[in-house]
Structures are given as C-alpha cells and as structure tokens.
C-alpha cells in the first residue's frame, strides 16, 4: 500500500490519474445490441486523440440500459482495446447497492484501473456512504466517489468522512450544481488528501472548475480532445488563451445529447452506427440540427489535431 499525502492509499498501475477522462457512449447495432467494433473504435479514439483516461459506462454510456452480463463482458472489450495505454475506469452505478457491489467485484476480477459509482436513485446519503464501504470490501484499487444531484448527493463533510475512512477513496467526481462552487467546497476539505477532484457537466464549466481546485474533468469523449487542449494550455499558464478555446467549444457542449455524441463520433470516423437503444424522440437530430452543428464545428476545426470532421451524409 502507498501513502498519499500522509494517507495510506490503494494499489494501482497508474500512480496518479488526472486530466480529461473521456466518457464512452455505448454504440448499438440495428437490433439494439452493443456494437463491439464501434465501442473498440471509441476506446482507441480516446487513446489516439490525447485524452488522459477512459470511463465506461456512466450516464454518457447509458449504464441504465445495459444488462449485467453485457456490461461486464464489454468492460473486457474496452480493456482489451486500450491495452494499458490509458487508465480505464469502470462505471459501477446500478439500480441497487448490491448491483453496484457486483460491478465493483467485476472490476477487481478483471483488473479495472479504477471504479466509479454514484448511489442508486431514491436512496439517501447514509446508504450512499455504506455503498462506498461495501465497494472497498471487494475492490482493492482506487475508488472514485461520484457526487451528483438526484443520486443521494453527499455534503462536503460527508465526502471528507469517506476519504478519512476508506484508503481506496483517492478521487472525487464532484458534479452537484453549481459545479464550480461545490468543487471549491470539496477541495477546501479534501484537496490535500485526494489525488484529483474531477468536474463534470460535459466540460461546460472547465475553466472555472480548474480555477477552484479541480485537476480534471470527465466529459463525453467525442470532443474531449479539444478539452485536453484547453486543459494543457491552462496548466501551461496561458489562461486567457484556454478561455478563448473554451468559448469556441461551448456552443457545441451546450447542445450535447446522446444522438449528438453519436453523430459527432460518426463525423470523425469513429462510429459506424447512429442507432439508439430506445427511441430518441425530440432529441433526434433533424436536418436543421445537422446544419447548425456543421457551422459550429467549423469554428473549432483548427483545435482538432486528429480525427478531422468528415462531411455529413
């Protein structure tokens, strides 16, 4: 066991995880089955486009639509494709605490570099805290606390209690809204005892989050390489230039949906399928949506170093 800032920490092949961790959308074929080739392509895209880590499946990956067997099976798919190039964080959120623990155990058995979970819906903070204790009973590596509205959110002092109690809790994804203020709250309590506080919200508030103590963010992966550029420029000290790039990207983040994510990944030659597991309804992209997206993509073309945007079909 390592000691991190005076705290006995967990074992992991990645000593420290921070930066931009891309969240993989789950691709489907015409029959609604997980499309392995596209999932592999998305994982490889994250590796090749300079992202700092991979997370699957969380909200972006529609964990709530995935069966237990296919979720565990495709953790193996993602890890096989990544091949140790980046840390892979396994999303363990579920419909019950027992299911979360099942996924945490699968992460241990299959060698996930970290696991992340938020409490099941319609539970409370005490159940959430017990859930992380039970995860630590079956998983030896670093655990990420995902603190989100509507999923038994924890107060800053409760997050600090978990950090004190559980050696494996080395990371926090703080996304109670307003995110930057809550990141500042958690940073003031545990910033010297965790390795990274991640933000969320698709990177919408990335500069403000970094300014308040975050060392990373977990956005959907389809444009996360641009967020990597923002992150790197910010860490290099040119904060105004980082904000300029962020202002160019922000209109695209603001219209992000699951159909949008799949569409961008297809435009970048990553996904072959735009299929949804459930009907997208009003979120389905129409011709006007695609024209607007194309206009907004032109603004960030020079910020994209690989996987350029292909023409709309």
Show where each model-derived region lies.
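Active-site beta->alpha loop and helix N-cap motifs at the rims of alpha/beta catalytic domains
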Residues: 13-152
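A general structural signal for well-ordered alpha-helical segments in protein cores
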Residues: 39, 75, 100, 132, ...
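Short secondary-structure transition/capping segments
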Residues: 66-69, 126-131, 156-158, 211, ...
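Catalytic alpha/beta core domains of metabolic enzymes, predominantly
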Residues: 149-257
């Amino acid at each position: 066991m390592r000691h991190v800032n005076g705290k006995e920490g967990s074992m992991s092949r990645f000593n420290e995880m921070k930066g931009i961790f891309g969240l993989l959308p789950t691709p489907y074929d015409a029959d609604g089955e997980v499309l392995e080739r596209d999932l592999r392509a998305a994982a490889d895209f994250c590796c090749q486009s300079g992202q700092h880590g991979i997370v699957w499946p969380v909200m972006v990956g529609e964990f709530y639509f995935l069966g237990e067997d296919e979720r565990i099976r495709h953790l193996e798919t993602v890890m096989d494709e990544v091949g140790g190039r980046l840390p892979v964080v396994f999303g363990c959120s579920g419909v019950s605490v027992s299911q979360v623990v099942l996924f945490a155990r699968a992460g241990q058995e299959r060698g996930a570099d970290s696991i992340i979970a938020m409490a099941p819906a319609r539970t409370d903070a005490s159940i959430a805290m017990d859930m992380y204790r039970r995860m630590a009973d079956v998983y030896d590596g670093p655990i990420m606390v995902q603190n989100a509205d509507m999923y038994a959110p924890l107060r800053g002092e409760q997050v600090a209690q978990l950090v004190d109690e559980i050696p494996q809790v080395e990371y926090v994804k703080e996304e109670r809204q307003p995110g930057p203020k809550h990141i500042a709250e958690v940073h003031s309590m545990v910033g010297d005892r965790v390795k990274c506080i991640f933000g969320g919200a698709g990177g919408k508030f990335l500069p403000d989050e970094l300014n308040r103590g975050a060392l990373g963010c977990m956005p959907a992966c389809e444009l996360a390489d641009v967020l990597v550029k923002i992150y790197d420029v910010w860490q290099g000290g040119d904060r105004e230039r980082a904000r300029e790039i962020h202002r160019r990207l922000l209109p695209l983040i603001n219209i992000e949906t699951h159909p949008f994510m799949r569409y961008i990944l297809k435009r970048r030659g990553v996904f072959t399928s735009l299929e949804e597991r459930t009907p997208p309804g009003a979120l389905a992209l129409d011709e006007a949506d695609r024209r607007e997206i194309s206009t907004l993509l032109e603004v960030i073309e020079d910020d994209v170093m690989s996987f350029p945007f292909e023409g709309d079909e």
